[in-house]
């Protein structure tokens, strides 16, 4: 597999998906987030490698111009399974968490960041590739838990079944993207050094799983999960498959007068900071 990597060797690096920019946010906010994330990476001393597929070419370290081109021209939303297809067909494609972890590991990136991961959708057999990729690839993934639109109980059980290790960063509860609380307890850690110790143990055991580091949305931007659930009940689903998540997130932005968008941007910024700190200290260890 040929990946055009623009990563400077020897420096800490964090991999980031393109789906969050192309399918998860309005264009203006997506570009602002990209610029802010790059600014954070410069301030904190790490490289941010935004990973995507441009006309069949896999790129690790996309530029703002390339990201804008992807938004303008359109891009498929792909998990690990679809990568060879879009590459062979020369298409544009935005990577999900699963594809980003898979491609990151192929070029030596150990730390990946996102907003929220996929999981099990309610009411039907719809399980995200994010879960299966995390169950077979060793990496550190910083997120704010699973997306609030998912079946929380089923996803939590699937994470256990797939033996995916997870820890709460300064929290005792599994966060749900816009919401800090779920009622499900997780092992709590207080600092990045604890992340590194756990990850080192995983390496020693040759445990090929992704360590989920759960970083809750900042308290001032939180939207309680019961409020999100009430709103979701009012939405009539008009799409299926990979279009479900972007559709629901867009509807929630409209129904909350932009509160979910502000929460999304805030948690993504904090997750980039934490992932960068982990990558920097991992490189030194």
Curated annotation (Swiss-Prot):
Top EC class, one word: lyase
GO terms under biological process: nucleobase catabolic process
Source taxon at top rank: Bacteria
GO CC terms in record: cytoplasm
Pfam families: Indigoidine_A
Active site, per annotation: 17 (proton donor), 147 (nucleophile)
Annotated residues for binding of Mn(2+): 126
Entry function: Catalyzes the reversible cleavage of pseudouridine 5'-phosphate (PsiMP) to ribose 5-phosphate and uracil. Functions biologically in the cleavage direction, as part of a pseudouridine degradation pathway.
Quaternary assembly: Homotrimer.
Family under the similarity heading: Belongs to the pseudouridine-5'-phosphate glycosidase family.
The name this protein goes by in its record: Pseudouridine-5'-phosphate glycosidase
Organism per entry: Thermotoga maritima (strain ATCC 43589 / DSM 3109 / JCM 10099 / NBRC 100826 / MSB8)
Lineage: Bacteria, Thermotogati, Thermotogota, Thermotogae, Thermotogales
């Amino acid at each position: 597999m040929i990946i055009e990597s623009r990563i400077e060797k020897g420096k800490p690096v964090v991999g980031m998906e393109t789906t969050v920019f192309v399918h998860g946010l309005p264009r203006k906010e997506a570009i602002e987030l990209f610029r802010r994330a790059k600014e954070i990476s410069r301030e904190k001393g790490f490289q941010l490698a935004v990973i995507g597929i441009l006309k069949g070419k896999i790129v690790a370290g996309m530029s703002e111009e390339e990201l804008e081109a992807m938004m303008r021209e359109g891009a498929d939303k792909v998990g690990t399974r679809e990568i060879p297809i879009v590459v062979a067909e020369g298409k544009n494609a935005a990577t999900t968490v699963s594809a980003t972890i898979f491609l990151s590991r192929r070029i030596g990136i150990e730390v990946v960041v996102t907003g929220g991961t996929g999981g099990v959708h309610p009411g039907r057999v719809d399980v995200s590739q994010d879960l299966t990729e995390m169950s077979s690839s060793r990496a550190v993934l910083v997120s704010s838990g699973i997306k609030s639109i998912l079946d929380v109980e089923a996803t939590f059980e699937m994470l256990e079944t797939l033996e995916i290790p997870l820890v709460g960063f300064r929290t005792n509860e599994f966060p749900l993207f816009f919401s800090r609380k779920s009622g499900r307890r997780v092992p709590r850690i207080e600092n990045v050094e604890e992340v590194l110790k756990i990850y080192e143990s995983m390496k020693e055991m040759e445990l090929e799983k992704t360590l989920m580091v759960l970083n809750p949305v900042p308290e001032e931007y939180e939207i309680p999960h019961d409020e999100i659930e009430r709103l979701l009940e009012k939405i009539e689903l008009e799409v299926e498959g990979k279009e479900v998540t972007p559709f629901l997130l867009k509807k929630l932005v409209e129904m909350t007068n932009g509160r979910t968008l502000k929460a999304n941007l805030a948690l993504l910024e904090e997750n980039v900071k934490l992932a960068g700190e982990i990558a920097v200290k991992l490189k030194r260890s």
